[in-house]
């Protein structure tokens, strides 16, 4: 959800997002120090009464302003590389779900331990309850166990979409005919919202993503409920 004045990042709900916030703060500190140094140098040069018009080169200062920026780039690049590899790290996931983008909704499949499939459509304004988020609520949420390593397979059935949940630090393109994967781990219980982040047609703005992180025992109960509903639906179709 939006932060005060919409200036800060969302509260982290996953280890990856926490690392992204740390990296953001690290880079911002470096940028602020560089900016202050440049403004200070400009102020000193402008206000100085001493001008030497015949200075053509200075080997020492040229060496300094070559070496120092190189060191700064290394200081910025090393945490960036660490974070880049961390986002791609996927070690023995305990649960795998598949997310398929359609015009203009998402469908999900839980195929590891359960045979659960459902579509997730945005709730129209007339169906919202008090306190629901406008243009972000869906009829079927993605329910995941907290503190569990989850692999998400992302693809699309028609055009390119993008499966994005900012609070979890997730963004992956959904490309027709291709399976992309990302690692997900919710570090706290809560409801986290996202949207399709790739323009995909007229109703691109109406493809929300809602992830509900719950304790493991609650997740198991939800799976049993979904299986019962699917079994009941199959019986009704046979009749």
Swiss-Prot record:
Segments crossing the lipid bilayer: 27-48, 63-82
A biological-process GO annotation: ATP synthesis coupled electron transport
InterPro entries: CcO_II, CcO_II-like_C, CcO_II_C, Copper_CuA, Cupredoxin, Cyt_c_oxidase_su2, Cyt_c_oxidase_su2_TM_dom, Cyt_c_oxidase_su2_TM_sf
Co-factor note (free text): Binds a dinuclear copper A center per subunit.
Top-level division of the source organism's lineage: Eukaryota
GO cellular component: mitochondrial inner membrane
Keywords from the UniProt entry: Copper, Electron transport, Magnesium, Membrane, Metal-binding, Mitochondrion, Mitochondrion inner membrane, Respiratory chain, Translocase, Transmembrane, Transmembrane helix, Transport
Pfam families: COX2, COX2_TM
Membrane-related topology note: Multi-pass membrane protein
UniProt catalytic activity: 4 Fe(II)-[cytochrome c] + O2 + 8 H(+)(in) = 4 Fe(III)-[cytochrome c] + 2 H2O + 4 H(+)(out)
Localization per Swiss-Prot or TrEMBL: Mitochondrion inner membrane
Function: Component of the cytochrome c oxidase, the last enzyme in the mitochondrial electron transport chain which drives oxidative phosphorylation. The respiratory chain contains 3 multisubunit complexes succinate dehydrogenase (complex II, CII), ubiquinol-cytochrome c oxidoreductase (cytochrome b-c1 complex, complex III, CIII) and cytochrome c oxidase (complex IV, CIV), that cooperate to transfer electrons derived from NADH and succinate to molecular oxygen, creating an electrochemical gradient over the inner membrane that drives transmembrane transport and the ATP synthase.
Protein name: Cytochrome c oxidase subunit 2
Taxon lineage: Eukaryota, Metazoa, Chordata, Cephalochordata, Leptocardii
């Amino acid at each position: 959800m939006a932060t005060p004045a919409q200036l800060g990042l969302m509260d982290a709900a996953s280890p990856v997002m926490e690392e992204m916030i740390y990296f953001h703060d690290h880079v911002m500190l470096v940028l602020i120090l560089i900016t202050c140094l440049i403004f200070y140098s400009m102020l000193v040069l402008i206000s100085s009464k001493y001008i030497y018009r015949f200075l053509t080169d200075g080997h020492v200062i040229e060496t300094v302003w070559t070496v120092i920026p190189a060191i700064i780039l290394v200081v910025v690049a090393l945490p960036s590389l660490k974070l880049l590899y961390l986002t791609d790290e996927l070690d023995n996931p305990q649960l795998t779900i598949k997310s398929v983008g359609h015009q203009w909704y998402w469908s999900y499949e839980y195929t590891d331990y359960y045979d659960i499939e459902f579509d997730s459509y945005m709730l129209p304004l007339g169906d919202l309850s008090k306190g629901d988020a406008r243009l972000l609520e869906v009829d079927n949420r993605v329910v995941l166990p907290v503190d569990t390593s989850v692999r998400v397979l992302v693809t699309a059935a028609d055009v390119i979409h993008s499966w994005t949940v900012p609070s979890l630090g997730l963004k992956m393109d959904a490309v027709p005919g291709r399976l992309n994967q990302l690692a997900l781990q919710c570090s706290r219980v809560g409801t986290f919202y996202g949207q399709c982040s790739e323009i995909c047609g007229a109703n691109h703005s109406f493809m929300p993503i809602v992830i509900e992180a719950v304790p493991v025992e609650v997740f198991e109960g939800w799976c049993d409920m979904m299986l019962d509903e699917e079994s009941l639906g199959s019986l009704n179709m046979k009749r």
